[in-house]
């Protein structure tokens, strides 16, 4: 992972059950020179994260509602348990984040580092990622 004000290169894992979102995020993030791996189920992503000795991911971006039985929030908890604490987790959701305490509790506990309300414009997502990593390293 290298940091400069204008060029952050991260290892990012993206998990979403919607192929268009996976493709869009893959293209967007690779276009910013990030290394990206995508999964369409939380269970596959978790298996990948826990079954190999990988260079740790810098960031996991996961959808909240996933059909595989493991929600994005459950995946976030497991990521924090099984990977280095330096791995950040962004939870994406189409739900109103103010409608439930579950989201604010996840932020307070450190289970997730950011909650991203969908849809999010590409430039805003990039800004959130850059702000999170630049702030963390200063």
Q: Where on the chain are the PLM-derived regions?
A:
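Acidic, metal-coordinating helix/loop segments flanking the phosphotransfer/catalytic sites
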Residues: 38-59
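Active-site residues of response regulator receiver
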Residues: 16, 63-64
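A Lys-centered signature of the CheY-like receiver
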Residues: 118
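Two-component/phosphorelay signaling modules centered on CheY-like receiver
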Residues: 19-37
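Non-catalytic signal-transmission and effector/linker regions of two-component phosphorelay proteins
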Residues: 1-13, 19, 85, 121-138
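Acidic catalytic/metal-coordinating carboxylates
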Residues: 40-44, 70-75
